[in-house]
Regions:
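A short, surface-exposed alpha-helical micro-motif characterized by mixed small hydrophobic
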Residues: 171-173
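ABC ATPase "signature
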Residues: 189-190, 198
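Conserved ABC ATPase signature
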Residues: 104-108, 112
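Conserved ABC transporter NBD signature motif
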Residues: 22-31
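Conserved ABC ATPase "signature" region
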Residues: 30, 81-99, 208-209
Length: 213
């Protein structure tokens, strides 16, 4: 859907980062009914990568601290060396190097910062990652690299992405199923191939025409 259609709001609501009504079912549990303590185990399994690779990383923290923050919260029983090993594994997974661990976000390009954000999500071995326009702030060539990385990681760990985007070319490269939103409502949903080849809603047809004309 276009900007303002409710995509990001829906993603944040699913993660219970904003108040919402309705039901959110994960592993046979309705997250809406859970108190903070009962919700904590699910927080580990439900991660997010934000759109802005510049604003979503604390400028006062090193890469090691940023990527390892979730481990300190969700796996406090880990020793320092175990935590460091998991952080190293995560940053190598996303194509960064060990010597980058003690550097700060301002020392990196946009694409590298987004890789740090992805490593921060991956280090907890989540089941679902909400990807909130993770490539929209990047140059086209860097976008392609991040899309390739996301596909590779998804296959390796059998991850589910809720990939939020208005860029249908990126959606086509990644999505198995698509939900089209307009003004806060779902207007069409189905398998990606079906949506791209035989859209039924006029709004979906307009989006596809604009993206691929």
């Amino acid at each position: 859907g276009e900007s303002g259609s409710g995509k990001t709001t829906l993603g944040l609501a699913i993660l219970r980062m904003i108040p919402s009504t309705g039901e959110i079912w994960v592993r046979d549990e309705n997250l809406q009914t859970l108190k903070k303590k009962a919700l904590k185990p699910h927080r580990k399994d439900l991660q997010i990568v934000f759109q802005d690779p510049y604003g979503s990383l604390s400028p006062r923290m090193t890469v090691n601290q940023i990527v390892g923050e979730g481990l300190r919260i969700h796996e406090p029983e880990l020793s320092e060396s175990e935590k460091n090993n998991k952080v190293l594994e995560a940053i190598l997974e996303v194509g960064l190097e060990e010597q980058m661990l003690e550097r700060y976000p301002h020392e990196f390009s946009g694409g590298q910062r987004q890789r740090i954000s992805i490593a921060r999500a991956l280090v907890l071995k989540p089941k679902l990652i909400v990807m909130d326009e993770p490539t929209s702030a990047l140059d086209v060539s860097v976008q392609a690299q991040i899309v390739d990385l996301l596909r590779e990681v998804q296959r390796k760990y059998d991850l589910v992405y809720l990939f939020i985007s208005h860029d249908l070319k990126v959606v086509r490269a990644l999505a198995h199923d698509i939900v089209v939103m307009k003004e806060g409502q779902v207007v069409e949903q189905g398998p990606a191939q079906e949506i791209f080849e035989s859209p039924s809603h006029e709004y979906t047809k307009e989006l596809l025409t604009a993206a691929f004309m």
